[in-house]
């Protein structure tokens, strides 16, 4: 018979293998037969493996029968419930560990911080931070890193920054977390400043640093900065790393530079699911929907399984192309994957069928959703509105309120779009007022555009002009563009020129869409010099070479 030490070595080697649920059950049986079931190390490993395979029942049974629970075992079960988003149980377990003889360690607080950020419980997150400080772990690297990340994810960037600055000697992982936090919260410039400070303090960036640095570059206006980040990746030979490659593809996609995104993608030796998803999303964002569908087809052929978010994006491309054939193919694929009940996928399917003219299919899908939420309602209301079924769309809005759901900005965009398609000016004005007074939602550009279109369609151009001029300055050029379009339709050249002058003051005259409209207005006035100037500039809008920039 093998000694206890030999058995432990055998079991240790077994635990290093990939653990399926069946393998974990075999390991559990072997550990029990070897009389090592009460060994804290193996109990912790088994609980962790059960949790990884989403078998909470077995993990909890193991935890409950174990007499002497180490902090590692507590952490395993807390992590398991946090992974399953059962945060009430997580809190209950934390209360139990505080009452027990076991003292929570830095990993315990790190796990709890992640749980609170996942549930967007900022009050609980602050409370855990306070308890960690009292226990002497507030400035621990692991605990601090998790809390900084949790604060950032919850949008509490000030708290995250204060905690980061209070930690005496942050390691590279903590620097990366803070740079990522700044990027995700929209402070890309602060992330870059921190990146420079990090290097000044003697830390060399790794692949995770560069991924964090790309996180805040999400706008076409930041393309120069994006190129500089890419150049730095090339300089330190990190561009070939799979994580960095995927991040660069995603960065360029969000900056609407699909050519650079494709170039990086093609340089990746074996593009994984993340890289493919990033490029497909980029194609969709840039309006290259056929390319998005083509790459998605290649992804399917390769055997990679997309997630619900990617499927929803691809269905959006089908909707934009009004391609019901591809849409139905994706729907069949969704059923084979078992994703047909996912609320994001269902909502995307409803939107796709509506925009492809198959409203009956959309309504049938909506009826089959077991737990409808505001996203699915929004998709159906928009579909009904686009097809002119205004009364049914407003019935669905009433149903939203009766179910106790809270309408959001998109709900009111869909309702105002419905009013536009059916010419319901009075109803649109009523909805616009209710949005502000009853639901406390501040109108966005899209809502104002619909209101201008409604008034313009009714021929009330002067009223629309007064409405637009009453808005806070500077007025968004999208709203002015909608008014200019209405002036063109009704051939009101006098008002069109006034609106055109406002667009010119906004500095948006350079955009091709406004150049075309403005040139049409000036043509009616016979101002041919202005027409020639504007139309000559259209072909040059994107022809110039941008100057270089470097902040490294």
Curated annotation (Swiss-Prot):
GO terms for biological process: mitochondrial RNA modification. It holds the Pfam family PPR_2. Residues 479-552 are annotated as: Type E motif. PPR repeats lie at residues 39-69, 70-104, 105-139, 140-170, 171-205, 206-240, 241-271, 272-306, 307-341, 342-372, 373-407, 408-438, 444-474. The keyword Lipid metabolism does not apply. GO terms for cellular component: mitochondrion. Keywords: Repeat. This is Putative pentatricopeptide repeat-containing protein At1g64310. The lineage of its organism: Eukaryota, Viridiplantae, Streptophyta, Embryophyta, Tracheophyta. The gene is PCMP-E65.
């Amino acid at each position: 018979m093998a000694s206890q030490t030999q058995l432990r070595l055998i079991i240790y080697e077994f635990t290093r293998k990939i653990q399926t649920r069946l393998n974990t059950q075999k390991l559990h049986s072997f550990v029990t037969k070897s009389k090592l079931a009460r060994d804290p190390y193996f109990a912790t490993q088994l609980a962790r493996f059960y949790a990884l395979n989403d078998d909470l029942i077995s993990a909890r049974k193991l935890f409950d029968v174990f007499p002497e629970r180490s902090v590692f075992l507590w952490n395993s079960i807390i992590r398991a419930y946090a992974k399953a988003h059962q945060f009430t149980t997580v809190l209950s377990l934390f209360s139990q560990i505080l009452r027990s003889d076991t003292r929570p360690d830095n990993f315990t607080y790190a796990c709890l911080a992640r749980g609170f950020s996942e549930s967007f419980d900022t009050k609980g997150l602050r409370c855990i931070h306070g308890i960690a400080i009292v226990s002497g772990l507030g400035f621990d690297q692991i605990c601090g890193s998790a809390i900084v990340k949790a604060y950032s994810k919850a949008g509490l960037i000030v708290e995250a920054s204060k905690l980061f600055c209070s930690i005496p000697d942050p390691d590279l992982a903590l620097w990366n977390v803070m740079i990522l936090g700044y990027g995700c919260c929209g402070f890309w410039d602060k992330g870059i400043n921190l990146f420079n400070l990090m290097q000044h303090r003697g830390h060399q960036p790794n692949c995770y640093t560069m991924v964090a640095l790309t996180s805040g570059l999400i706008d076409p206006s930041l393309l120069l900065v994006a190129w500089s980040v890419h150049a730095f990746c090339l300089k330190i030979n990190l561009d070939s790393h799979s994580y960095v490659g995927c991040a660069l593809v995603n960065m360029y996609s969000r900056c609407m530079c699909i050519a650079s995104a494709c170039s990086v993608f093609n340089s990746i030796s074996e593009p994984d699911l993340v890289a493919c998803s990033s490029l497909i999303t980029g194609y969709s964002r840039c309006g290259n929907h056929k390319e998005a569908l083509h790459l998605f087809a290649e992804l399917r052929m390769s055997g990679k399984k997309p997630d619900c978010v990617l499927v929803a994006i691809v269905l959006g491309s089908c909707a934009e192309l009004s391609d019901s054939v591809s849409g139905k193919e994706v729907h069949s694929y969704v059923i084979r994957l078992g994703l047909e009940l996912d609320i994001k996928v269902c909502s995307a399917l409803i939107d796709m069928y509506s925009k492809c003219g198959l409203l009956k299919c959309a309504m049938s899908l909506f009826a089959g959703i077991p737990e409808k939420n505001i996203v699915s309602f929004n998709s159906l209301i928009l579909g009904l509105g686009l097809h002119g079924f205004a009364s049914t769309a407003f019935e669905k809005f009433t149903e939203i309120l009766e179910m106790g759901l809270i309408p959001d900005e998109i709900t009111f965009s869909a309702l105002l779009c419905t009013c536009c398609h059916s010419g319901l000016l009075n109803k649109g004005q009523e909805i616009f007022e209710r949005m502000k007074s009853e639901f406390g939602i501040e109108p966005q550009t899209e809502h104002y555009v619909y209101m201008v279109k409604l008034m313009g369609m009714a021929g009330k151009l002067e009223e629309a002009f007064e409405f637009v001029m009453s808005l806070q300055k500077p007025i968004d050029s999208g709203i002015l563009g909608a008014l200019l379009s209405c002036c063109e339709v009704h051939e009101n050249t006098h008002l069109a020129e006034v609106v055109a002058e406002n667009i010119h003051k906004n500095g948006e005259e350079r955009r091709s869409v406004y150049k075309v409209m403005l040139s049409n207005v000036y043509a009616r006035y016979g101002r041919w010099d202005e027409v020639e100037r504007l139309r000559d500039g259209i072909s040059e809008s994107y022809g110039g070479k941008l100057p270089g920039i470097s902040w490294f």
